[in-house]
């Protein structure tokens, strides 16, 4: 009995020395056909856009996968400035998912550009103002 316990402890110590499995290893969902894993569609997005689209820590990916019936992999590349989006699905679904994601990215880019322009306009107006701003009320 003591020998078995010693063997168990030695084996447990060895197991602790192994590296953890890669987070990219996933089990194929039951609803996804294996043959659709052959030809993925790959495209790139800026990392800040991926954070907005896929949520913090890519929390929205499973829901997007279920709704689109496609598998998505979102991996950081280029020192965290870009992310690689890989879409596994039928070709028509791949194109649709890519189109939706790029449309979302376009909307977020436009919103960011609009916000930056508004900040610049506010700074310009503050710089042009002759003194402290006093709200003027129209006389009724």
UniProtKB/Swiss-Prot annotation:
One of its GO terms (molecular function) is RNA binding. Keywords: Cytoplasm, Nucleus. It comes from the Eukaryota. One of its GO terms (biological process) is establishment of spindle localization. It is found in: Cytoplasm; Nucleus. Its main location: cytoplasm. CDD domains: FILIA_N_like. Residues 40-101 form the KH domain. GO terms for cellular component: cell cortex; cytoplasm; cytoplasmic lattice; nucleus; protein-containing complex. Gene3D superfamilies: K Homology domain, type 1. Pfam families: MOEP19 (PF16005). Belongs to the KHDC1 family. Component of the subcortical maternal complex (SCMC), a multiprotein complex that plays a key role in early embryonic development. The SCMC complex is a structural constituent of cytoplasmic lattices, which consist in fibrous structures found in the cytoplasm of oocytes and preimplantation embryos. They are required to store maternal proteins critical for embryonic development, such as proteins that control epigenetic reprogramming of the preimplantation embryo, and prevent their degradation or activation. Component of the subcortical maternal complex (SCMC), at least composed of NLRP5, KHDC3, OOEP, and TLE6. Within the complex, interacts with NLRP5, KHDC3 and TLE6. As part of the SCMC interacts with the SCMC-associated protein NLRP4F. The SCMC may facilitate translocation of its components between the nuclear and cytoplasmic compartments. Forms a scaffold complex with KHDC3/FILIA, and interacts with BLM and TRIM25 at DNA replication forks. Contains an atypical KH domain with amino acid changes at critical sites, suggesting that it may not bind RNA. This is Oocyte-expressed protein homolog. It comes from Bos taurus (Bovine).
